[in-house]
Amino acid sequence: MRYLTIALSKGRLTDMSVEIFEKIGIDCTELKSSTRKLILSDEKNKIKFFLAKPADVPTYVEYGAADIGIVGKDTLLEEGRNLYEVLDLGFAACRMALAGPAELQGKIDELNIKRVGTKYPNITRNYFEKTRRESVEIIKLNGSVELAPLVGLSEVIVDLVESGRTLKENGLVVLDTIADISARMVVNRVSMKMENERIQKIIDGVRDELSVRG
């Protein structure tokens, strides 16, 4: 029996994923250790894990380097990879939003937006072209996106919003919700066919655990 490989997003999704996997009988001892090993395993269940940057997880899954991945919906929307999205895990919930200065609230249809600051150029382009049918200049940023409208780099931003506290503290508000975001389980298309029974068992186990949690 070959190993199933699971790619986990580095960061807070790792701990949440480990908690669920342990509940369904997967041994995550190595994964929780301080080892420097890049590939970690559960020998009993023939499962291997590795941690990757969130943006890379869909790539590993699409190309079959991982059979299963745990990643945020924001990354899936931005990367647009060809894979199966099989479960909404519900945790790490937030929303992708269009945000800007408070004085623009309620005036979204009147806005003449020319520039948008964001870490998510593909999501932003799709939103403006398909939903708003507008052409804008998208400025790719890597740091604090909220800074862009404050210094005149852009009129508005597209970013993840959780509590909205950072926006509020900087005089910004949500102007429109683009998508609801949470952690998702994804599966390689070929693996889903070739290892269907084993993968489906994991999917069903996680789904049952999530339903118990409500």
Swiss-Prot record:
User: Do you know which InterPro entries this protein is assigned to?
Assistant: ATP_PRibTrfase_cat, ATP_PRibTrfase_CS, ATP_PRibTrfase_HisG, ATP_PRibTrfase_HisG_short
Point out the signal peptide segment.
Answer: none
Q: Is Lipoprotein set as a keyword in this record? A: no
Where is the major localization of this protein?
A: cytoplasm
Q: What is known of its domains?
A: Lacks the C-terminal regulatory region which is replaced by HisZ.
Query: What function is annotated for this protein?
Result: Catalyzes the condensation of ATP and 5-phosphoribose 1-diphosphate to form N'-(5'-phosphoribosyl)-ATP (PR-ATP). Has a crucial role in the pathway because the rate of histidine biosynthesis seems to be controlled primarily by regulation of HisG enzymatic activity.
What name has this protein been given in UniProt? Answer: ATP phosphoribosyltransferase
Q: Which organism is it from?
A: Ruminiclostridium cellulolyticum (strain ATCC 35319 / DSM 5812 / JCM 6584 / H10)
- Gene behind the chain: hisG
